[in-house]
Each structure stands twice: as structure tokens, then as C-alpha cells.
């Protein structure tokens, strides 16, 4: 904890020399621990996840409020690519940045939050090193979560609204709320059509359509209750 505090005291720019501010040990002792200390990462992560699940699921049982599993990914950019860096950073790659609209060099992580009744906790931060797809990473998260004690929801962007992920979360009691890419194929009333074509025929007066305003300027998104339930198992690439 003293290490974490010393890092944040300097505004995310903490160095080993700052350990002396919050620790009674000499900075070289702390540095030695960071460089050579041994601990079981998987056991630590398992214990942390277990405590978070216990707290969030207990809150859901006592309050009756839904659990939200929130997934997103981000890139920690680095200024110099490996061809220019004197000491290339381990596990850094070029990733497609939707924010910048181009390839960005750095570390990409998938973050998973669990939230219920105003309590939001970080369940997992997984480094995306391209040995496993982001779709598979999130599917594994869905598989390891216990079944939700109440009706709950998985929140994501259009990258994660795939049939496999939605099915995995549905098996654990989580319905998906997420954006759809316009080229997704849906089957309303058993009729095959693109999401873009279906959207053109939606009307505000339709009893199955609920307008949801998202903080994106003048943009509004429509949510069709019938479709979201019907197509949990029928969404295809």
C-alpha cells in the first residue's frame, strides 16, 4: 500500500526515490522487493476476484438491483515505436485506435468492472498481447463469473456484441446491452436482414421501441426490447 500511495502522491509520476515519503524502509529495499520478490500472481488475482464477486453479488441479493458487467478496452500509448526506442518495451504492439483513427503503438488492456446499486469495482484488467483474441478474453470472463442472483446486464461497445459472448453471458443470467455494427445480420420474425436495414423501418410509435439518449451530442440510440431478447442467440457476423 505504501508503494501505491507514493506513486499517486506525485500525480502518477512517482519514482522509487519517493518510496521514502510513505515507507519506513529504505528505497533500495523496496526496489529490491519489486525486482526480485516472488509471489503467486494467479493466486492473488483469484483472491481479489473472489472478494469482488462476493461483495457485488451480496449487494445484488440484498438490494434486488441488477449487476452490471462493464467491459471496455484502451491503449496506453508510447511515444516511440520499437524501431526507434533504445530499450524496446516488452509486450507493446501496434493496435488499431478507434479514438485516433489509426494504428497506435503501446499496451492494450481489456478492463472488466462489476457494478451494483452504486458500488463499482474493478474485477479484472487483462493485457491484450495478441496470443488470445479480445473476444475469447471476454468469453472467458463470462465463463468464470457465477450465475447472477438477479436479472443482470452485460454492457459493451459494438466490438463485443458477438453471438459467442452474448450466449456466454446469457447462460450466467446477464442480458447484453451494447451497440451493433450496421453490417450485423438479424432475424426479426425469422426474416434475415442487416441491422442497418432494420433501423430504417423503426418508428418512435412502435410499442417495442424505447428511445435511449446517450451523452454523445445530438445522437440518440434506439433499443428494441423484442429484438434484444429474440436475438441473443441469433446474432451472426
Give names to the regions the model predicted.
Residues 1-44, 48-49:
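Gly/serine-rich nucleotide phosphate-binding loop at the start of the catalytic core
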Residues 16-20, 65-79, 112, 154-161, ...:
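Short, conserved catalytic/metal-binding motifs centered on acidic residues
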Residues 28-33, 37, 93-151, 234-237:
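Electropositive, glycine- and tryptophan-enriched low-complexity nucleic-acid-binding patches
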Residues 36-119, 217, 225-227:
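Active-site-proximal, Lys/Arg-enriched surface segment
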Residues 78-80, 122, 164, 187-188, ...:
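Short helix/loop capping segments that flank catalytic or ligand/cofactor-binding pockets
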Residues 114-116, 125-127, 158, 178-182, ...:
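Short, structured patches in soluble enzyme cores that scaffold and shape functional sites
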Residues 130-197:
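Domain-level cores of phosphate- or acyl-group-handling catalytic modules
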Residues 131, 175-237:
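An anionic, glycine-rich sequence signature occurring as long contiguous blocks
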Amino acid at each position: 500500500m505504501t508503494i501505491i500511495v507514493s506513486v499517486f502522491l506525485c500525480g502518477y509520476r512517482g519514482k522509487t526515490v519517493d518510496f521514502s515519503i510513505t515507507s519506513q524502509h529504505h528505497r533500495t529495499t523496496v526496489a529490491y522487493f519489486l525486482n526480485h520478490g516472488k509471489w503467486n500472481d494467479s493466486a492473488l488475482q483469484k483472491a481479489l476476484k473472489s472478494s469482488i464477486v462476493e461483495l457485488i453479488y451480496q449487494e445484488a441479493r440484498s438490494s434486488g438491483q441488477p449487476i452490471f458487467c462493464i467491459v471496455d478496452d484502451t491503449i496506453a500509448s508510447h511515444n516511440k515505436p520499437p524501431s526507434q526506442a533504445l530499450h524496446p518495451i516488452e509486450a507493446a504492439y501496434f493496435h488499431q485506435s478507434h479514438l485516433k483513427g489509426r494504428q497506435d503503438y503501446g499496451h492494450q488492456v481489456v478492463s472488466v468492472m462489476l457494478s451494483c446499486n452504486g458500488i463499482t469495482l474493478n474485477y479484472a484488467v487483462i493485457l491484450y498481447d495478441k496470443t488470445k483474441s479480445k473476444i475469447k478474453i471476454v468469453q472467458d470472463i463470462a465463463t468464470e463469473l457465477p450465475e447472477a442472483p438477479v436479472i443482470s446486464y452485460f454492457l459493451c461497445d459494438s466490438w463485443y456484441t458477438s453471438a459467442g459472448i452474448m450466449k456466454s453471458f446469457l447462460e450466467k443470467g446477464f442480458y447484453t446491452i451494447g451497440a451493433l455494427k450496421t453490417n450485423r445480420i438479424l432475424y426479426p420474425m425469422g426474416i434475415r436482414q442487416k441491422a442497418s436495414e432494420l433501423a430504417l423501418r423503426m418508428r418512435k410509435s412502435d410499442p417495442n421501441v424505447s428511445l435511449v439518449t446517450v451523452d454523445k451530442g445530438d445522437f440518440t440510440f434506439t433499443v428494441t426490447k423484442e429484438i434484444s431478447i429474440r436475438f441473443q442467440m441469433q446474432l451472426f457476423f
